[in-house]
């Protein structure tokens, strides 16, 4: 089942990460949907230190190497760790007590949008980077891997199998949305600034700081 476009449009007016908010505002400005003043207003409170992508920490130190359980298609970048949640009810219950969760589904459905907002990431067995689930994840700034063909979900047993590894709902996994890898447990990550996005944002702020002076001078 695919996401309903109207519902997606409604849901995407809710919470986004700073990185997603900046990217969306700048893209809309570049496409002519909003003007520069509106883009500036929408990004005014964003801090540069928040505009980055998490990547796996260096594993050069002996003994720190970790091997992925499986591979999927990287659909939205970043690195997140959280408990496996197999449905929206579980995601809401665990997120409600402050626990980080990763939503794991065969294929995302319309009813999963609310759960995706609560989760840090999404892992699906089916789908492609252009699937609605992936688009929604990118708009919300959620890490997303789709098309993980080695993923098997047993809802009756509340278990997940990736290759030969059997995991239970509540076990912690890490999604690497940059490389499309799934890991068992929590894997250390570091924030890497999005230099291209920062340059675009700085150019916007500089141009809008100069514009009022030009208008004043022209009066």
Residue ranges and their predicted role:
Residues 1-63, 168, 179-200:
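Terminal amphipathic helices with adjacent charged low-complexity linkers/tails
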Residues 78-91, 95-100, 106-219:
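Acidic, glycine-rich flexible loop/linker segments
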């Amino acid at each position: 089942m695919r996401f309903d476009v109207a519902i997606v449009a409604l849901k995407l007016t809710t919470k986004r990460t700073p990185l997603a908010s900046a990217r969306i505002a700048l893209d809309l400005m570049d496409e002519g949907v909003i003007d520069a003043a509106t883009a500036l207003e929408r990004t005014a409170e964003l801090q540069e230190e928040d505009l980055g992508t998490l990547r796996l920490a260096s594993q050069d130190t002996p003994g720190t190497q970790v091997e992925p359980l499986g591979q999927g298609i990287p659909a939205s970048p970043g690195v997140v760790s959280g408990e496996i949640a197999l449905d929206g009810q579980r995601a809401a219950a665990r997120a409600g007590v402050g626990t980080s969760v990763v939503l794991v589904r065969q294929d995302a459905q319309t009813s999963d949008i609310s759960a995706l907002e609560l989760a840090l990431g999404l892992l699906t067995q089916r789908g492609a980077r252009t699937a609605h689930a992936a688009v929604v994840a990118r708009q919300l700034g959620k890490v997303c891997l789709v098309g993980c063909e080695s993923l098997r979900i047993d809802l009756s047993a509340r278990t997940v199998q990736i290759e030969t590894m059997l995991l239970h709902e509540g076990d912690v996994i890490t999604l690497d949305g940059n490389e499309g890898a799934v890991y068992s447990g929590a894997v250390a990550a570091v924030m890497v600034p999005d230099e291209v996005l920062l340059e675009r944002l700085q150019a916007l702020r500089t141009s809008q700081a100069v514009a009022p002076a030009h208008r004043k001078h022209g009066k």
